[in-house]
């Protein structure tokens, strides 16, 4: 797990412009605009104004894109250490391995002294996967040194760590991932990824859904029940759409379902304001039918007829 200390505050402007040019982006007007964005004045709390000499604007519309340009060089360097290592590729070609048959190529590469590694990155958040702890420790040192020398970026030693995925979870983009045994194949232990919503994301989702469920029961101010239900349904779709790729999403959504059903049972079902009877609610759209049509958890508001999407019913 890598964490770059204050990444967006420490991007080197000169290096970034050279990277943009090296990528083939040579429109001088565009580069001028990017320079102006990078050097946009910042008003300080005391009222003074400073011109930044490094970093990209926090929340700036092109900051994520600039982050990818900066770290694109890291991606290629990591790839060159294993997947696209020129020495290994030459060795594979000499052995007559065709380019399409990468599995055989990797088998040969594993017999060399190369360090097997695979990177997954989103903006400045990235993970590097290795087979052994010793390899991971060496990779950690190498990447830390490379980032410092090539991009002038510093790794946070407190937040950067080596994790054994057989024993502990690693969090990435709101997910927590681990590997678990899946029997043996050709005499070797095989593993598959086990993934869930990370604890913080699950807790936040639970709090927001429960709060919105209470607002359906008792709308705030002049907001109507149908607006509150629509807001709740949007939240359900957002959570399910993002996290549905996790293997354990059904377990996580059942946890959320129990929390919101406590609110609905105490505040809505008890007051006879919800019904399971689909004839008393509005007709479901084609998309709603495909997604929730088979769910016994679906409820309808008796007053406005809107369906309340069941957070506990999620399909991969």
Where is each model-derived feature located?
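Alpha-helix N-cap/helix-start motif at coil-to-helix transitions, marked by capping-box chemistry
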Residues: 28, 69-72, 203, 226, ...
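Short, solvent-exposed helix-loop connector elements
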Residues: 51-56, 213-227, 239-251
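Non-catalytic, peripheral interaction segments enriched in hydrophobic/basic residues
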Residues: 228-282
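Conserved polymerase palm-domain catalytic core
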Residues: 1-157, 162-165, 169
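A conserved non-catalytic segment of reverse transcriptases
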Residues: 39, 43, 48, 151-221, ...
């Amino acid at each position: 797990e890598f964490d770059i200390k204050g990444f967006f505050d420490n991007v080197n402007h000169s290096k970034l412009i050279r990277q943009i040019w090296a990528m083939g982006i040579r429109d001088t007007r565009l580069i001028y605009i990017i320079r102006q964005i990078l050097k946009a004045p910042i008003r300080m709390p005391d009222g003074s104004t400073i011109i930044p000499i490094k970093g990209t604007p926090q929340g700036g519309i092109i900051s994520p894109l600039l982050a990818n340009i900066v770290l694109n060089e890291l991606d290629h360097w990591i790839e060159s250490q294993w997947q696209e290592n020129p020495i290994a590729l030459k060795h594979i070609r000499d052995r007559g391995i065709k380019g399409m048959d990468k599995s055989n190529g990797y088998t040969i590469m594993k017999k060399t002294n190369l360090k097997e590694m695979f990177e997954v990155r989103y903006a400045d958040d990235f993970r590097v996967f290795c087979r052994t702890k010793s390899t991971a420790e060496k990779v950690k040192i190498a990447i830390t040194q490379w980032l410092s020398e090539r991009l002038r970026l510093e790794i946070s030693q407190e937040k950067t760590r080596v994790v054994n995925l057989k024993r502990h979870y690693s969090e990435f983009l709101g997910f927590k991932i681990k590997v678990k045994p899946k029997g043996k194949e050709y005499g070797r232990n095989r593993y598959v990824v086990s993934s869930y919503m990370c604890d913080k994301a699950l807790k936040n989702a639970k709090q927001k859904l429960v709060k919105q469920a209470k607002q359906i029961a008792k709308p705030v101010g002049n907001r109507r029940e149908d607006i509150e239900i629509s807001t709740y349904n949007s939240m359900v779709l957002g959570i399910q759409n993002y996290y549905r790729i996790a293997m354990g999403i059904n377990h996580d959504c059942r946890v959320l379902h129990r929390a919101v059903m406590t609110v609905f049972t105490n505040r809505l079902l008890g007051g006879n304001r919800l019904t399971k009877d689909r004839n008393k609610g509005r007709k479901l759209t084609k998309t709603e039918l495909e997604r929730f049509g088979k769910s016994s958890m679906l409820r309808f508001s008796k007053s406005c007829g809107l369906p309340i999407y069941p957070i506990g019913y999620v399909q991969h």
